[in-house]
From Swiss-Prot:
Organism: Prochlorococcus marinus (strain MIT 9313)
Coiled coil: none
Location (main, coarse): membrane
Pfam families (UniProt xref): PSII_BNR (PF14870)
Keywords recorded for this protein, A-Z: Lipoprotein, Membrane, Palmitate, Photosynthesis, Photosystem II, Signal, Thylakoid
Biological process according to GO: photosynthesis
Subunit structure: Part of early PSII assembly complexes which includes D1 (psbA) and PsbI; not found in mature PSII. Binds to the lumenal side of PSII complexes. Interacts with YidC.
Name of the featured protein: Photosystem II assembly lipoprotein Ycf48
Length: 335
């Protein structure tokens, strides 16, 4: 009889724990009645990683497995392109940036390409074999000028179209999982394990390390429109700097929804809304600085992790936005 009661107690305990855990990970938000996103299919198994336009209509998307596609209608449709690269190299094209007709591509392993005719032709540039890390981010700074950051936190600049590169930091930051550059020329990076982050302000030549704000490992960091930082951490935590100019001062953690998936990116749309994207089609927005959130109905239907949100607001009348997913999934901002 005692064994019977013991087994019954264990069953009840397991059921109670299961119910409690399910309550922790299935919270839901209201679903928005409409979506400003239009789904596009790139018809590829590759993951799109970055997008840039040379003008209002003409642009490129790049990604894994040598993915490069071209659009001539503002990103409504895309056609496959190819680059003159070794057939046996499976390049990961991770960053692209245009300023008018001049464009740059950074890829892994050890790839930087340059175009001066809006991407009709691309030339591969030679890089030093001892370059710390692999190219991670390329930024167009004007005619023949660009800045290259590696996944080890090394920063290089060229002023002659990529013929020569000059280091701008005295030593690399170490292996990073995420690295971003602000419009003002500042950098922020997340260590490979997510246990700290580093900043490099314009004019500095040494990275400054900062402790994470909680026990949760940092997933990604970036810049708000006002130049302050935002942080996404494991456990679906979102934080914003709450003191101007103080990168170590963070507001209370926002956890809009706990569905078992981490957020991977955060971005501000042209109307001031804040968007968070993450695993299993997670795409949510807030219109009141995080006080309340809604699930986007279009993102919720995507059979993909949503890994990056990009907005280009340089032209107020023709603002562009994209959410990049996996296996060719792409959402286009239609406002």
């Amino acid at each position: 009889m005692s064994r019977l009661f013991s087994n019954l107690f264990n069953l009840l305990l397991i059921a109670a724990i299961g119910f409690g855990l399910s309550g922790c990970v299935t919270s839901r938000l209201p679903v928005a009645s409409t979506s400003p996103w239009q789904p596009l299919e790139l018809n590829t198994e590759s993951n799109p990683l970055d997008i840039s336009f040379s003008d209002a209509n003409h642009g490129f998307v790049v990604g894994t497995n040598r993915l490069i596609m071209e659009s001539n209608d503002g990103g409504v449709s895309w056609k496959k392109r190819s680059l003159d690269l070794e057939e046996d190299e499976n390049f990961r094209l991770i960053s692209i940036d245009f300023n008018g007709n001049e464009g740059w591509i950074a890829g892994q392993p050890g790839l930087v390409m340059h175009s001066t005719d809006a991407g009709k032709n691309w030339s591969r540039l030679k890089l030093e074999n001892k370059l710390p890390g692999d190219p991670y981010l390329i930024t167009n700074l004007g005619p023949n000028n660009a800045e290259l950051a590696t996944n080890a936190g090394a920063i290089y600049r060229t002023s002659d179209g990529g013929t020569t590169w000059k280091a701008t930091v005295s030593e690399a930051a170490g292996a990073v999982r995420d690295l971003r550059r602000s419009a003002a020329g500042n950098y922020v990076s997340v260590s490979s394990l997510g246990n700290f982050f580093s900043t490099l302000d314009l004019g500095q030549d040494v990275w400054q390390n900062h402790e994470r704000v909680s026990s949760k490992r940092v997933q990604s960091l970036g810049y708000q429109p006002n130049g302050e930082l935002w942080m996404v951490a494991r456990g679906a935590e979102i934080r914003l700097n709450d003191q101007p100019g103080n990168v170590d001062s963070w507001g209370k953690a926002m956890i809009p929804i706990t569905n078992g998936y981490n957020y991977l990116d955060l971005s501000w749309d042209p109307n001031g809304g804040i968007w968070a994207a993450g695993g299993n089609g997670t795409l949510i927005k807030t219109l009141d600085d995080g006080k309340s959130w809604q699930i986007d109905p279009m993102g919720d239907t995507q059979p993909s992790n949503l890994i990056r949100i990009l907005f280009d607001t340089s032209s107020e009348s023709q603002a562009k936005g994209f959410v990049l997913g996996e296996r060719g999934h792409l959402l286009r901002w239609v406002g």
